[in-house]
Amino acid sequence: MAVFTEVSNTQLDEFLSHYDIGQARSLKGIASGIENSNFYLDTDKGKYVLTIFERLNKDQLPYYLELTSHLGKKCLAVSYPIPRKDGGLLSEINGKPCSIAPCLSGTYVEKPSAKACREMGEMLAKMHNAVEDFPLSQENTKGSAFWLSSMPLLKPYIPDRLYQMLEEEVTRQLELQKSPEYQALPAGAVHADLFRNNALINKNGDDESLAGVIDFYFACNAPFLYDLAVTLNDWTIDLETGEFEPERAQAMLEGYNSVRPLTEEDHKLWQDILSAAALRFWVSRLYDYYMPRPASLLTPHDPPHFSGYTLPL
C-alpha cells in the first residue's frame, strides 16, 4: 500500500469518467504497506479507496476482485470493488491495473482489545463459511514455491545460523504439506494476510468494534486454519515481547469457534500451522527488507518480528 505510482489530475478525471461515483475533490496517498499504491479518494458523491496494483497483472486479478465481490454480496463488511459503468471490476492508470472500493469506516488499531479480537475471529469464520460456494481457485503466491525461490537470494544477507533455521523449517513445512493430515484440513478461499493493518476498527471511548476487512490481494486457496493462524499471530501478541497474550488469543479462538467450530484435524495440526503462518511472513519480510523496491512513501515491516514463531509453540 505504499505509493509507487503517482496519479495526475488528468489521469484521475479520465479514470473517474468510467464510474458513476462523482467528480474528484481530493486524492491522498496511503503510506502503509509495501505491495500496492493506495489512495484515499474523495468525490462529490462519497469517500473511496483507489488501488493501483504494482505486482499483480490484469490476468492475475479476477480471483481477488471476484472474491471480495462475492463476500460483499454475502453482506460481509469487506472492501469490495465498485463496478465500472460497463460492469467491469478492473480499470487502468499509467499502464497498471487498478480498482476502486468504498472507504470503510474505522481506523487501524495497534493493539486491538479482546472484544475486537473476538469479533475478528467471528468475522474470519463467517468469511470461511461464505466461500463454500465460491468457484474460483488461486495458489498461495507466498507459499512453498516463494519460500524456495527466496532462500538463495536471502543467503548472502543473513547469518548462517539464521539461514540454517529457515532452511530446516521450510523443509519441515514442505513435508507437512504432503501429509494426509494436512490434505484433510478444511480449505477454501482465504484472506491470508489479515493483519491488524488490514482491518478497520471503530472506537467509542474504550469500546472497540470491528468495522471491516480490507486488502485481499494475497488471498488464495489454503486451509482455513492457516488463515486463522496468520491472523492470530499478528493480532494477539505482545508487541514488546513477541509472546501471545492469552486473553486476546482466547477471545479470537472463541469468536471463531462460535461461528465455525474447529475440527479434530484442525486441533492436531494447530501448532504446525502457526509455524507455517509465521514462516510465510518471516521470509517475505526478509525479502522485502533486503531487496526493496523504490516508493515515494514506503514503510518497511520488521522481519525479526516473526523469527520466534517458526518453531512449534
Question: Model-found features: residue ranges?
Answer:
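All-alpha amphipathic helical-bundle segments outside canonical DNA-binding/catalytic cores
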Residues: 264-274
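Conserved NTP-binding catalytic cores of kinases and kinase-like/nucleotidyltransferase enzymes
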Residues: 1-85, 203-208
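A cross-family kinase active-site recognition segment
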Residues: 110-164, 185-187, 298
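Active-site acidic catalytic loop and adjacent metal/ATP-binding pocket
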Residues: 36-44, 49-50, 81-82, 174-226
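An alpha-helical support segment within catalytic cores of ATP-dependent transferases
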Residues: 7-19, 135-136, 150-192, 196, ...
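Active-site activation/catalytic loop segments of kinase-like enzymes and analogous catalytic loops
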Residues: 225-261, 275-293
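ATP-binding pocket architecture of kinase catalytic cores
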Residues: 43-136
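ATP/Mg2+ or Mg2+-diphosphate-binding catalytic cores
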Residues: 141, 152-153, 281-313
